[in-house]
Each structure stands twice: as C-alpha cells, then as structure tokens.
Amino acid sequence: MTYEFEPACRRMEWLDPFYKQVWEKAYADAIPISGTFELTPRCNFNCSFCYVHLKEKDISKYGQELTSKQWIEIAKQAKDEGTTWLCITGGEPLLHPDFEEIYTTLAKMGFFITLQTNGYLIKDKYIKIFEDYPPRGIKITLYGASDETYQKVCGIKDGFTKVHQGIQLLKQMKIPVQLVSTITKQNIEEHKKMAFYAFINQIPYASTGGIRNSIRKENAELDEIRVKENIEKSKIEEIKHFINNPINIERKPCTYCKDYRLGYWITWDGKIRFCSFLNEPDISIKELSFKEAWQRLVEFEDQLDWPQE
C-alpha cells in the first residue's frame, strides 16, 4: 500500500515557525534531530506507577548502565547525525554515578538540553553545575502539594519541602521550569492545590489522569491507583476526537507520532527505541554506530502497519 505522509510537527501549533521548518526538513530527510537519553533506572522515589525504576542492587539483574564514556561517545555521534534537542531523563538522572561529567560534556557540545527530574536533589553541587551550564529548561514532576502526599505517592519524607526548595533555587537562577503531574487516587485531593502552587509561582503546569500500561514493567498496581472518573472522561474525549478526526488508513500509522523519522529514545542499558513505553525493537547502541542504529530504527518504523482487525 502507498501511504500518505504528513509530519506530526505540522499539527504542533505551539512550535515556533522557524523550528517548525527545521523539523519539517528533519522529517523529510530522516534526520534524528531530537533525542532522549534515559541515563539510569535509579531513583530516590518509589512511585508505584513508574516504568523505569530499579534499586541499585537490582540493576545488574536487568542489564548494565552505560558509562559516562559511552554516553558521551553516543552524543558525539548523534550530534554528527543532526541531533540538536536532547532530553536527559531516568529514573532520576541526577543519580547516575557520572551525571556531572555526562551533563557538562553534553552542555559544552551545544545541545538544547531539557532535564527531567523529580526535583528533590536540586541543591548543592547541582546548583553549581546548572549555574555554569544552564539547561534550556527543567521539567519537574510534581506529585503533591504537601509532604504527606509525597509520602503516600513516592514513599519519601519531606518530598514537597525539598522539591519546593529546588524549584525556588532554579527560579532564582532564571532557569525555565515546567511542572507536570500524574493524578492518581493517592494525590487527586491535592490536584487543585498543585495547580494553584504552579499559578502563584508563575510556572507552566500540565497534569494527566491517564496512567498508561507499559510493557517495560509489570502493571499489577496500576488499576488500584487509577482515577476511574478521569479514565471515563479521557475515553469520552478520545472518542470525540476520533469522530471529528477519523484515522486515515491511507496514512502511515507512525506519522501520528511527533518523533517519527526525527526522534529517538535510548534506554539506560543501551537500546535505541521509538518510544519510552516500548521494549522493541532490540537495537543495541553498544554494538552499532549511532548512524547504523538510527537507520535500523527508521527501517523498523517504516515496516509498522495497521493491524488487520
């Protein structure tokens, strides 16, 4: 079948016109302009709905973390192939043993870096790092508006207090901060308080009640913490969307994703993938050059098709 093609960036109204042209060019030529480095599965929080979280003693059972040398070499090759936007995430990325070396080296290479963190550790040496090499932005996941809710959701004491302190330090340094929340039964009572916290601190805020099943982790606890009402509302909105914007089967399925032909995700153990939630394809960045791995990923995406039923 011959498919219609349309880059998802054409539907991203918020994207600057100049950058939209850049992304269109990247889409046309399959240039990996945007990447995510999942530095580590380590995390100081213990959220039941997280799909990338291992205790240090368990990491070796599932794989081996990439070293600073490996991440830096991947970044050099990715830059040569066109990567400009880079998201650094985890787990909690600040817990990678070589975070400082990795981050500062990548910053010196000129990437537009967004850091995704829970915000708990933003103090001391990390403040100095971000003062010297400010990221383009920091996205912090807000789990509640009190220490009590952080204890329920994340299993950690003084969570909100520490995160609030980190946010204020970042604001003082004028580093752009964005707050995001996943709303569950454990924190729904503080949803409005979280939104108000973002408002009074003049920080962009987004929340979701949708907890996606991930095939990278067992999902046994997810049904227990999902907010059923949010699921129903979400389903209704999804149905309305597809009534008004029916899926075009003449259009290649991957083109509905903004990262198709221009974005990638590299896992903590060195697999390059299309999406953070998937456990395939199994393309090892340790065994191939970045260019070869990217080409294989694009080929994998191009082979994806609609299901028969």
Model regions: which residues?
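Radical SAM enzyme [4Fe-4S]-AdoMet core and its adjacent flexible, acidic
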Residues: 1, 136, 141-261, 265-269, ...
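Flexible mid-to-C-terminal extensions adjoining Fe-S/redox cofactors in radical SAM and related proteins
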Residues: 1-25, 29-31, 254, 269-309
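Conserved alpha-helical substructure of the radical SAM core
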Residues: 2-137
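Short, intrinsically disordered, charge-biased short linear motifs at domain edges
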Residues: 33-34, 238-246, 299-305
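Alpha-helix N-cap/helix-start and coil->helix boundary motif
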Residues: 44, 100, 146-147, 291
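Residues that scaffold the ATP/ADP-binding catalytic core of kinase and kinase-like folds
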Residues: 46, 50, 125, 148-149, ...
